[in-house]
Structures are given as C-alpha cells and as structure tokens.
C-alpha cells in the first residue's frame, strides 16, 4: 500500500494517544497518530518520523504520522542509552543528528490500518500462498464474529485475521504490545470456525524489513500467548510475514519464522 505525499520530521512529544507534535520544515506541527497504541519504544523524542499530508481541508490536523526510524542498539558501549530527552524543542533538534543519524536505524511503519490494506493488495495480486482467489471479502461477518478477510479459491473456504506487529526487541518481533482481550476473542472465534470446517489463519504482518523471528508477547499478555498455542494445536494456521518498508509504501515480502 502506498501513501501519496510523505515528508520527514522530528518527533517532539505525544500529549495523548491521538496526536503528536512534530517539527516539520522547522515548524512545530500537530499530527494525527495513526496508531492509538502506546508505542513508547518507537516515539522517542528526537527520532525521525514520517508524516503523510492530508488532502482534506476540513481536518483539524494536516498530517498523519505513519512511520518512524527506530535506533537499533549495537550493545557496544551503552553509556548514552540513558540520556534524558529534554523538553526543549531546540535541544531535541540539536541532539537529533548526533543521536539518531549516526546509529543504525530500522524503519517501522506504525500505521494500524496499513497491515489490512497491504494484505488486501497481496491477496488480490495472486502473490500469496493462496494463489488466484475466486472471492475476496474484507471485514466479513460470520455468526457473531467479524474477520478481516474471507476468501474462496479452488473450493477452499478461508477466514484470515490480520495482526500488525510494530514491537521489536533485539531482532525479535512480538505481539501484542499491550493486553488485547479483543485479540484473544478473535483467536477463540477462529478455533470455532476451524471446527465448522473452514480453513483459518492468523497472519502477523511485521511492519519492518528485518527480524529474526516472531513470538507472542507472553510477558505483556500471557492469555494471548496461551490462546495462540491452543489455536495452533486445534489446527488454526499461523503465518508471519515481514514487509518491505519505505517512508511512503509498505508491501508484504518474506515469511518469518514463528516461535510459540
């Protein structure tokens, strides 16, 4: 999936989960954050972010914050890891070059709507493991459940639930980044659908280009990790895919190993 106009900026602060203050072209702008999650490990004052320009003149905010460069620690000399970020905008901008531009960075798309859009393109293109699809229905209801995708191909009937992954720790990517009762509910509903004869998949879309493997975040939400293991045992298929990511585009790329 592709964005029309994207420009870089320097993240300053996030007063609430909906907006962030970003320095764009030397001016402090209020941007809509397209991810209501905590994202504290991503939105570090002074980091480089990327914002899509909105074409809607009636919006309160002109920009959508969609991607961020995360500094990847090399574990050699951790002395500057504990540097306290100043609340002063000028200090943040002055530190930006020294702290971020000289380190290895990982570009992460943090738009919570991007995974479903990218998966829809991937499925429709015929490049997925499902091949050519006869019927593709996003946001499909089934009983009391609602799944991200329903598809039919070669007489197969398939439900897919998509989860976007932005949390990375030393090359390991994890989901969720916060407790998700809704996520547990989705897993149990897929187990039920599998029992009814449908093929069922949970697809973790890793919104970055580099990772060693995916694993459920048991420390943050053990119930989700347990539900995922139960689903695997019941026959629900688990998939994880890395993406190619640029400031203005994200596409599904290579499968990634899963460790439960």
Feature-to-residue mapping (PLM):
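Conserved catalytic cores of phosphodiester-cleaving nucleases, focusing on short active-site segments
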Residues: 9, 147-176, 190
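Short, charged beta-turn/beta-strand-edge "cap" motif at the junction between a beta-strand
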Residues: 13, 53-58
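Short aromatic-glycine-enriched beta-strand elements
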Residues: 17-21
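Short alpha-helix capping/helix-loop boundary micro-motifs
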Residues: 29-39
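Short nucleic-acid-contacting surface segments enriched for D/E, G, S/T with interspersed K/R
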Residues: 37-50
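Acidic-basic catalytic patches of nuclease active cores, encompassing PD-(D/E)XK
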Residues: 40, 74-76, 84-97, 105-136
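Nucleic-acid nuclease catalytic cores
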Residues: 164, 171-181, 188-220, 242
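Domain-level recognition of nuclease-like catalytic cores that cleave nucleotide substrates
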Residues: 207-260
């Amino acid at each position: 999936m592709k964005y029309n106009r994207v420009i870089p900026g320097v993240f300053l602060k996030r007063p609430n989960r909906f907006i962030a203050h970003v320095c764009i072209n030397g001016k402090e702008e209020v941007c809509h954050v397209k991810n209501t999650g905590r994202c504290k490990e991503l939105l570090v004052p002074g980091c480089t972010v990327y914002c899509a320009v909105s074409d809607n003149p009636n919006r309160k905010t002109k920009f959508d914050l969609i991607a961020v460069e995360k500094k990847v620690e090399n574990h050699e000399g951790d002395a500057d890891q504990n540097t306290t970020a100043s609340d002063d905008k000028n200090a943040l901008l002055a530190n930006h070059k020294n702290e971020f531009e000289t380190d290895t960075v990982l570009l992460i798309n943090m738009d919570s709507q991007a995974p479903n859009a990218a998966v829809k393109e991937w499925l429709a293109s015929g490049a997925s493991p499902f091949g050519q699809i006869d019927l593709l229905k996003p946001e499909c209801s089934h009983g009391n459940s609602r799944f991200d995708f329903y598809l039919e191909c070669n007489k197969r009937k398939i439900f897919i639930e998509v989860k976007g992954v932005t949390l990375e720790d030393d090359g390991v990517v994890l989901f969720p980044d916060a407790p998700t009762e809704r996520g547990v509910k989705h897993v149990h509903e897929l187990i039920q659908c599998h029992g009814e004869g449908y093929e069922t998949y949970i697809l973790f879309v890793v919104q970055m280009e580099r990772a060693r493997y995916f694993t459920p975040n048991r420390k943050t939400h053990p119930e989700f990790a347990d539900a995922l293991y139960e689903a695997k045992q019941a026959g629900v298929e688990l998939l994880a895919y890395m993406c190619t990511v640029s400031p203005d585009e994200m596409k599904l790329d290579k499968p990634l190993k899963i460790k439960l």
